[in-house]
Amino acid sequence: MESFAAGLRSAVRRNPDIIGIGEIRDYETADAAVQAGNTGHFCIGTMHTKSPGETFARLLGLFPPEIRDSMAAATLSLVQFILVQVLVRTNDGGRQAVREYIVMTDELRNTLSGQSHATWGHYIDEIIRQEKRRIRDQVLTMYQNDRIEKSEAALFIPAGEFPR
């Protein structure tokens, strides 16, 4: 295949149960993913983002400004779950996956649909912050429980938030 987008369009014609998208990083792939979702296909895609809220901004930023609002509405109706994951080195020499996520409930969709899509990311990240489910919150707990070194924790916790 010449691109992720071409592969995605080809996959839709085969009527798969699940479509995996290695990485959504350009307009063509993002558009093909939304179109696949609009036709009822279950798609799982990856993006490099630091928070679930940033994912909306990054995805919508791939679309030209003249269609961004309509793609925001389509995306909001299609996205079910956003997960961000990092691997943290533990004191036993291993790594542990640490995740933050948002489940796109009908209530959350209704709230977001009444706002500008430019505010969605902040709103989502604020929910996660208030619930203390951010990656940095979990890493701090790991550090406080002596599961990771301070130097490892410092990779995920901003200096101003790191306990003395």
Name each region found by the language model:
Residues 1-164:
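Short, flexible helix-loop junctions that flank or precede catalytic/ligand sites
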